[in-house]
Amino acid sequence: MELRIEQLNFEYASHPLFREFKLQLGPGITWLRGENGAGKTTLLKLIGGAIAPHAGRIWLDDIEIHAQPLTYRLHCYYCGGDTPQLPWLTVREVLDMHVSLYAGTDPELLNAELAAFHLLPTLDQPVTTLSLGQHKKMQLALALSLPVALLLIDEPFNGLDVDAVAYLRQQLSAPPRLARQCIVLTSHLEPALPLVGTVQL
């Protein structure tokens, strides 16, 4: 699996973030570093298709994000920690929606990840009743379960307790995952993971 970005341009109002930006990544974990406002989260959203660049192209292997937007997005998952804007759904319904979208998801694996993050008792609660930390754990459980080629995680350790941080590091560092999945993450601290590279913004 290869992520390739060519000639990417993006700016907010009159503040340019990316000019002719290029990047090529393969399997393994890449750490995006940079000061606040450098564009780390924006780059993850651009790669994940949550926002569109003003110019440039992004590929996953031979799938181009604008030519095949749905196919592209079903090969990646963006874990940003944002609260889902679906107040009428339960936690279980939010999870079921993702399982139905991402073909090949193993429900038993998802349940195991939910158990590891102590989320099984919350399944029938409205998703709006989760704390910010629980929302993050729900997204991370999905991130660790979905059979995607590209995993994008914004500040994965923010809001997590010590046990959850240790578990997440263990799961992200598993050799089978590192061999098959391109993982791009931001972190304001050294992530203490087996990195294949660092990108300074």
Report residues per predicted region.
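A short, flexible loop at the N-terminus of ABC-type nucleotide-binding domains that lies
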Residues: 1-22, 26
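Hydrophobic anchor residue at the start of the ABC signature
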Residues: 140
